[in-house]
Design a protein with these regions (language model features):
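Active-site neighborhood of phospho(di)ester-bond hydrolases with catalytic His/Asp-centered motifs
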Residues: 59, 72-76, 96-106, 125-128, ...
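Flexible, acidic/histidine-containing loops and adjacent segments that form or flank the divalent-metal
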Residues: 27, 147-226, 232-235, 321-344
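Active-site-proximal loop/helix segments of hydrolase catalytic cores
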Residues: 84-85, 203-283
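Pre-active-site segment of Zn-dependent metallo-hydrolases
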Residues: 33-49, 57, 61-106, 111-118, ...
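Boundary at the C-terminal end of the N-terminal hydrophobic targeting segment
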Residues: 18-22
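Binuclear metal-ion centers of metallo-dependent hydrolases, dominated by the metallo-beta-lactamase
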Residues: 131, 136-159, 278, 282-344
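Active-site environment of divalent metal-dependent phosphoester hydrolases
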Residues: 80, 106-111, 131-134, 152-154, ...
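Bacterial N-terminal signal peptides
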Residues: 5-15
């Protein structure tokens, strides 16, 4: 009886050893971490099933790739002329998308969702206001539209992780501050005024997602959705695209979750934004911080450098890594070992 038992032991031991020595590349050799091409545009998926690849695409738009799943957090690939170009077109981002999660119904967060969803068959998730507009385009089948309110029980399962909708809050920046900021940016701009073609381009984009006065008001408190990502191996992430005050739903979530490994944390409004952004940092205690809605504008608003914010994060969470990645740069995290790699 001992020989068969020994044989079984050896088979199990060899199997475990083979898994431990699986020929996965290190992060600095992982193909998905060495390219600027998003997976949605035909770039490679990570070879290591434990590796998460994240790319900033502008404003609050991020691509998240894990195993065979490609998710867009917000979907506005086309950019207004006063944002730095990401050198991508909406059509290019239709090679592989499994789901689109929309934060709220302002155009720069969702105006390309119908096109991308139609061409990829991706599920499109968002609040009632955002999904009302998406449905009105007639490009997405009702079966692929998921309307959420973020009040619990709205979870979407993928290969190795799930995404839960959580009620958020849109940022509230005083009008007089915004007026002064725009005037200052206009006064010191080095890029010159927008060309007629740029003005036409921006007019088209700005008119794509019309909202009523009632919708604009409801969007602030009821129409902003954050998302909690729970991985099967225990890795946790949180995404929100607007820097409003933290909500009861977000606080209830963190009473259960404790802290997150990766936080997509909102930063909008320059120096005024640091206190509210730090409210998110204190609540979620992320090990890695990636900002949302932080990129600067030409002839519209003053730049919002993340240096002062990152210093505040370091002062309270010295072990946290606060990163403001360049457009399309791969940020790779091994969700088991927590190793972090930032590409070029």
């Amino acid at each position: 009886m001992r020989a068969p038992a020994l044989a079984v032991f050896l088979v199990v031991a060899l199997s475990v050893s083979a898994r431990a020595q699986a020929p996965y590349p290190t992060l600095d050799q992982e193909p998905a971490c060495q390219t600027l091409t998003p997976a949605a545009a035909g770039g490679p998926l990570p070879k290591n099933p434990d590796v998460l690849v994240v790319r900033f695409l502008g404003v609050s738009n991020y691509e998240l790739t894990y195993r065979n799943t490609v998710v867009l957090l917000d979907a506005a690939i086309d950019k207004l002329s006063w944002w730095a170009p990401n050198h991508l077109t909406p059509d290019e981002m239709t090679r592989h998308v499994d789901a689109i999660f929309i934060g709220h119904a302002h155009g720069e967060h969702l105006w390309d969702a119908p096109l991308i969803g139609e061409k990829t068959g991706a599920r499109v998730v968002g609040d009632p206001i955002a999904m009302g507009w998406v449905r009105s385009t007639g490009r997405i089948a009702d079966a692929k539209i998921s309307v959420v309110k973020g009040l619990g029980g709205e979870t979407f399962a993928f290969n190795g992780f799930s995404v839960e909708a959580v009620q958020g809050h849109h940022n509230v920046v005083p009008n007089d501050y915004m007026a002064k900021d725009r005037a200052a940016a206009q006064a010191i701009t080095l890029g010159g005024p927008l060309t007629p073609d740029e003005q036409d381009h921006d007019k088209r984009l700005n008119s794509m997602v019309p909202l009523t006065t009632d919708e604009r008001e409801r969007l602030i408190t009821d129409g902003t959705i954050a998302y909690y990502l729970a991985f099967d191996n225990g890795f946790k992430a949180f995404y929100t695209d607007s820097a409003g005050p933290t909500t009861a739903a977000e606080k209830a979530l963190m009473q259960k979750a404790g802290r997150v490994d990766l936080g997509f944390i909102p930063y909008y409004g320059g120096e005024m934004a640091i206190p509210i952004t730090m409210e998110y940092v204190r609540l979620f205690k992320p090990s890695v911080v990636l900002p949302t809605h932080h990129d600067g504008h030409r002839s519209r608003m003053l730049d919002m450098p993340t240096g002062p914010l990152n210093l505040a994060i370091r002062a309270e969470l010295p072990a946290a890594k606060a990163i403001a990645p360049l457009l399309r740069t791969p940020v790779c995290i091994n969700t088991v070992t927590k190793e972090l790699y930032v590409g070029n």
